[in-house]
Amino acid sequence: MNTFEMKTAIHFGADALGRLKEIPYKRVLVITDPFVVKSGMIDMITKPLQAGGKEFDIFCDVVPDAPVGKIAEGVKKFLQYQPEAIVAVGGGSAIDSSKAIREFALKINNYGKVGLVAIPTTSGTGSEVTSFAVVNDTEAHVKYPLISESLTLSLIHISEPTRPEPIS
C-alpha cells in the first residue's frame, strides 16, 4: 500500500491568484524580494487582496539564502504590523524567509496562529510544501536548518501556470 499525505492545500489553475481575495484573514503581510515589486508583479497579489477588502503591508527586502540580518528586519516588521497571515511571494528564499520570520516572531511574542500562504514564482525548492527552512549566518559562514511542523503551510499554496504568448 502507498500513501501520500500533505497538510498544504494546493490551489492552481486559471485565476488561482484571484482566490487571494477569499483567504480568511483581514490583515496580511506580503513578504517578497525587490524584483517582484519593481517589476510590477506585486500587482497580481495586491489587486486580489484589495478586491477582498484585505489590509496589507509589504516587506520586500528578501535576498537569496535568507541571511539572519534580513530575517531580523522581517521579524521587526511583523511585530510592528501584527498580521493575521503572511503571503510569501517568490522562490525558495522568499518562502524560507517568510517561514523563519513567522516562526521567530511567534516565539518572541507568543502571538498565536498566523496563516501562511505561498505563491511560488520558481520551481524546484519545494519550500512551499515542506516543514523546513534555511537561515544563513553570513558572518559565521553557517547555514542553519529550521525544522518544525509549524513551518508547513497549513492554508494554501497558489500556483498560476502560464504559457508563452505567441509573438506576432
Model-flagged regions — what are they?
Residues 1-85:
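ATP/NTP phosphate-donor binding region
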Residues 14, 141-142, 163:
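Glycine-rich, charged/polar anion/phosphate-binding loops
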Residues 20, 45, 98-101, 167:
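Hydrophobic packing residues within well-ordered alpha-helices of enzyme cores
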Residues 34, 123, 163:
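Glycine-rich beta-alpha junction loops
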Residues 39, 96, 126, 165-166:
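Conserved protein kinase catalytic core
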Residues 62-64, 122, 161:
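Short, solvent-exposed coil/turn elements at secondary-structure transition points
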Residues 69-157:
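Glycine/threonine-rich beta-strand-loop-alpha-helix active-site module
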Residues 156-168:
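Single conserved hydrophobic/aromatic residue that forms the stacking wall/gate
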